[in-house]
Amino acid sequence: MKQSEFRRWLKAQGAEFKDGTNHLKVFLNGKQTTMPRHPSKEIPEPLRKLILKQPGIK
């Protein structure tokens, strides 16, 4: 899954985003996590799962 697709999916789940210097801060369910900002690149599956786990989605 490309990072831009993952970001759209997170936004549909209610996530809010704030730009960092080289990353995006993701706010969801009162928790914060970060993800790299490379919208055209594939996001590795382990990283995607970690980003979902931190705010308690999966």
Curated annotation (Swiss-Prot):
Its EC number is 3.1.-.-. Probably forms a complex with the cognate antitoxin HicB 2 which inhibits the mRNA interferase activity. Gene3D superfamilies: Hypothetical protein. It holds the Pfam family HicA_toxin. The gene is hicA2. It comes from Photorhabdus laumondii subsp. laumondii (strain DSM 15139 / CIP 105565 / TT01) (Photorhabdus luminescens subsp. laumondii). Keywords: Endonuclease, Hydrolase, Nuclease, RNA-binding, Stress response, Toxin-antitoxin system. The keyword Glycosyltransferase does not apply. Toxic component of a type II toxin-antitoxin (TA) system. A probable translation-independent mRNA interferase. InterPro entries: HicA_mRNA_interferase, HicA_sf. Belongs to the HicA mRNA interferase family. This is Probable mRNA interferase HicA 2. GO terms for molecular function: endonuclease activity; mRNA binding.
